Swiss-Prot record:
Lineage: Eukaryota, Metazoa, Chordata, Craniata, Vertebrata
Gene: ranbp9
Amino acid composition bias (Polar residues), ranges on this chain: 438-456
Subunit organization: Identified in the CTLH complex that contains at least MAEA, RMND5A (or alternatively its paralog RMND5B), GID8, WDR26, and RANBP9 and/or RANBP10.
Name this protein carries in UniProt: Ran-binding protein 9
Domain CTLH: 285-342
Main location: cytoplasm
Length: 597
């Protein structure tokens, strides 16, 4: 009785182990191809990985994941020749491309050809016999370049030999290898978009291809390093001529503007002095931006919004979508327990919670008594998303003297479940948002080591707790505070009202709608940090918000929202991408990252 059951178990084990082995091989292939061809974007230009079952003559048979080729024709005359092309052409972004073919059996006569061909070349021929077809043949060692007449090139090859084919897309040449040794240049002036190709002609011929599935016999990586050095030397020796002084001055200005953009205050000042330049933004302004960036990157969004409103009074009023984005991020930081409003609720909610001016206050919130340690005079209406009622000329304070008690696990479970979500999430969320990114990834996370804010204030008692804690051993919603959770839910209602107001005033925006829904979705999970939307709680998500706010502030000073250095890097990257699309192989060895030290 146990026989059939035991047999099924054995078969299942074989299948599972076979799948695991295939997955491991695929992983190794991907790693090797990424190492060999780092400049290739396979989403745009896939690499050849096997022979194509759709692009071959009928006398060709494929097996072993379309890597083994065998001949199944009559093999009586040259008209019985048959070839097969790879699945994709060789991308120019490879710079140097290489594949190998092992002769498993030479068959009856060993009439085998290994090489390249363009799309559309006749597959009823050996590679090299027709226009835009190139091959090295095993029976006579001749090379065939778009002609039925071969030229003496190398030794013959037979069973057990490994023949490699290397295409140099920089100088458009091709050379072959035999058992790991180069045979020299075979073809020059090659056209672009060639496919690896192999052809057979007599019964019994069998060959295996290696497109990177296994380590190559020939040391192609050493050859690639040689060409990388050549290309980088050409870049280093690029002539500047008589404009060297002008070139140097331009680079210095780009570096200076980059330091100013990211608020590297002391460094920017020292660099400007050493290069005899003027800083085109007041030192106080740089330090103000530095302070705001630090607050955003540490998750203290409420204080960041408040400080922005104090230092740049009309900025957020003129940019309601920016304000909305900041407040959505503040809600996320509330869930995370990092925003100051939920970390320390002993004092008044910061003015950061003040609203989009002129909008109706739709929800009442509990008012917290302010302490007298610090006050700011402001000129804004604060009507919703603020936690307290306020008016023009209101004096606000935000020193937080005590932190609220924690909530028990069962209570947290209820608020993290569906009931908590229904309190906030509305099916009528309709709004818009600006894109987070500037087009160039910029991080200001190191921009706070130099200088200090001229608008700096005394630290609140809970400030030490507001810094990002990446080693939290017990993560709880809003830090586990019942009062904080209630405030977070209230803030969510107010944020919903703000979105509806924006929709009425500015029309629908699917991006804004998605942003708010994603943020509210965090409450659908008992452990939002390990949920499908938990990526929002990662501190790295603060960086695009910080960059967008920083750019908006710079624009108020008529300064570029992106530093010229970042734009130049982006342009260089786009040029390399264009070179790849137009067949210039040198782009493979000219990575922008190689020059960022």
């Amino acid at each position: 009785m146990s026989g059939p059951s035991s047999g099924c178990g054995f078969l299942m084990s074989v299948v599972v182990h076979g799948d695991l082995a295939l997955n491991e091989q695929e992983k190794e292939l991907n790693q090797r191809l990424r190492r060999l061809y780092p400049a290739v974007n396979e989403q745009e230009t896939p690499l050849p990985r096997s022979w194509s079952p759709k692009d071959k003559f009928s006398y060709i048979g494929l097996s072993q994941n379309n890597l083994r080729v065998h001949y199944k024709g009559h093999g009586k005359t040259p008209k019985d020749a048959a070839s097969v092309r790879a699945t994709h052409p060789i991308p120019a972004a490879c710079g140097v491309y290489y594949f190998e073919v092992k002769i498993i059996s030479k068959g009856r006569d060993g009439y085998m050809g290994i090489g390249l061909s363009a799309q559309g070349v006749n597959m009823n021929r050996l590679p090299g016999w027709d226009k835009h077809s190139y091959g090295y043949h095993g029976d006579d060692g001749h090379s065939f370049c778009s002609s039925g007449t071969g030229q003496p090139y190398g030794p013959t090859f037979t069973t057990g030999d490994v023949i490699g084919c290397c295409v140099n897309l920089i100088n458009n040449t091709c050379f072959y290898t035999k058992n790991g040794h180069s045979l020299g240049i075979a073809f020059t002036d090659l056209p672009p978009n060639l496919y690896p190709t192999v052809g057979l002609q007599t019964p019994g011929e069998v060959v295996d291809a290696n497109f990177g599935q296994h380590p190559f016999v020939f040391d192609i990586e050493d050859y690639m390093r040689e060409w990388r050095t050549k290309i980088q030397s050409q870049i280093d020796r690029f002539p500047i001529g008589e404009r060297e002084g002008e070139w140097q001055a331009m680079i210095q200005k780009m570096v200076a503007s980059y330091l100013v953009h990211h608020s590297y205050c002391a460094t920017a000042e020292a660099f400007a002095k050493s290069t005899d330049q003027a800083v085109h933004e007041e030192l106080a302004s740089i330090k103000n931006r530095q302070k705001i960036q630090k607050l955003v990157l540490s998750g203290r969004m409420g204080e960041a919004i408040e400080t922005t409103q104090q230092l740049y009074p009309s900025l957020l009023e003129r940019n309601p979508d920016l304000l909305f984005m900041l407040k959505v991020r503040q809600f996320i930081e509330m869930v995370n327990g990092t925003d100051s409003e939920v970390r320390c609720l002993g004092g008044r909610s910061p003015k950061s919670q003040d609203s989009y001016p002129g909008s109706p206050r739709l929800f009442n919130s509990p008012v917290h008594k302010p302490s007298s340690s610090q006050a700011y005079q402001t000129g804004f209406d604060s009507n919703y998303c603020n936690g307290v009622s306020s008016s023009k000329g209101h004096t606000s304070a935000h020193s937080h003297k005590s932190c609220p008690p924690t909530l028990s696990s069962p209570e947290l479970g209820v608020l993290n479940g569906s009931r908590g979500q229904q309190t906030i999430v509305s099916s009528e969320v309709e709004m818009e948002v600006d894109h987070f990114s500037n087009g160039v990834s910029e991080s200001s996370s190191n921009g706070f080591l130099n200088g200090s804010s001229t608008h700096g204030t005394e630290q609140e008692d809970c400030d030490a707790d507001m810094e990002v804690d990446s080693t939290q051993s017990k993560r709880q919603l809003c830090g586990g505070s019942q009062a904080a959770i209630e405030r977070m839910i209230q803030f969510g209602r107010e944020l919903q009202s703000m979105s509806e107001h924006l929709r009425r005033e500015r029309g629908k925006n699917s991006a804004n709608k998605k942003m708010l829904k994603d943020a509210f979705s965090l409450l659908a999970y008992s452990d939002p940090w390990n949920s499908p939307v938990g990526y929002q709680l990662d501190s790295i998500q603060r960086e695009p918000v910080c960059s967008t706010l920083n750019s908006a502030i710079l624009e108020t000073h008529n300064l570029p929202k992106q530093p010229p250095l970042a734009l130049a890097m982006g342009q260089a990257a786009q040029c390399l991408s264009l070179m790849a699309r137009t067949g210039s192989g040198s782009c493979a060895f000219a990575s922008v990252d190689d020059y960022l030290h």
